[in-house]
Amino acid sequence: MNKKTESKEQKRSFRSAIVLAGGRGRRMGMVEKALLEFERKTILERLLENLFRVVDEVILSVRDNSQKEKLFPVLDKFPDREIRFCFDSLEDAGPLEGIRAGLLESRSENSFVCAGDMPFVNPEIVDLLFEKASGHDAAIPRWEERMFEPLHAVYSKKMLPEIEKAFERGKHSVLAPVFQMQDVVFVEVSEIREFDPELRTFVNINTVEDLENMIGHAKEKVGL
């Protein structure tokens, strides 16, 4: 670690990450996507390794105790890291409920949020989003077509009352409370490409084909 990096880490505040692992993997036969293996590591293990390069705690947002028990063995690989679980209070409320539960559990003002099936989350991008979010309500990647990456973003606890209001209106989209917050920073994907040209940080695994493509891409990289 060079002196510049060390100085930067000493100055930064405590950071949390919320991993939304509560999805049922319906498009993959109801499997726990976070436990799928890729290059001898589960997706969750790979994700945690990347996150702990830039955060101090990780909160795993899960459906219930049954899912917690399935994921728990992965935590044995991180004995010196702070990893906790939180649970949805509302059924079938989607990822927005996972974000709400995670923000309530988080020890920091700002938390990075991502899905549990994203094996290539880039620590440099996470670091960038935390920096952009500092002093603001949120920092969210934005594409040129005005599409967003709300499940790869940093949110402050100021989002909590807006989530409650969204639920009261019957809205479960993650963007519903986002657009009600007053001070959201949108980070252009063109800026993110400077750190991650292929934008692999946004890759998630929804189908068997996604997993096969990911494995095929890795083989091409090593010339197999």
From Swiss-Prot:
One cellular component term (GO) for this entry is: cytoplasm
Q: Which GO terms describe its biological process?
A: Mo-molybdopterin cofactor biosynthetic process
Q: Which cysteines are joined by disulfide bonds?
A: none
- Which reaction equation describes what this protein catalyses? Mo-molybdopterin + GTP + H(+) = Mo-molybdopterin guanine dinucleotide + diphosphate
Indicate yes or no for the key word GTP-binding.
yes
Q: What's said on domains?
A: The N-terminal domain determines nucleotide recognition and specific binding, while the C-terminal domain determines the specific binding to the target protein.
Its protein name is Probable molybdenum cofactor guanylyltransferase
